[in-house]
Amino acid sequence: GCIPKHKRCTWSGPKCCNNISCHCNISGTLCKCRPGLFGW
């Protein structure tokens, strides 16, 4: 499984969905995505 953007996450996993452009943010709480082709 994976976590959709703007949902709660932890650095230990599971991964954010579409992890080409999405990652758990600096505080390890929310999946954030870069804008662009893969960011939506």
From Swiss-Prot:
Main location: secreted
UniProt KW keywords: Amidation, Disulfide bond, Knottin, Secreted, Toxin
Disulfide bridge positions per record: 2-17, 9-22, 16-33, 24-31
Cellular component annotations (GO), alphabetically ordered: extracellular region
Coiled coil ranges: none
PTM entry text: Contains 4 disulfide bonds.
SUPFAM superfamilies the record matches: omega toxin-like (SSF57059)
Pfam family, one: Toxin_9
Domain notes: The presence of a 'disulfide through disulfide knot' structurally defines this protein as a knottin.
Keyword Secreted recorded: yes
Keyword Disulfide bond: yes
In-chain residues carrying the UniProt-annotated modification Tryptophan amide: 40
Annotated protein name in UniProt: Toxin CSTX-17
Family from the record: Belongs to the neurotoxin 02 (plectoxin) family.
Superkingdom of this protein's organism: Eukaryota
GO function term, MF aspect, one: ion channel inhibitor activity
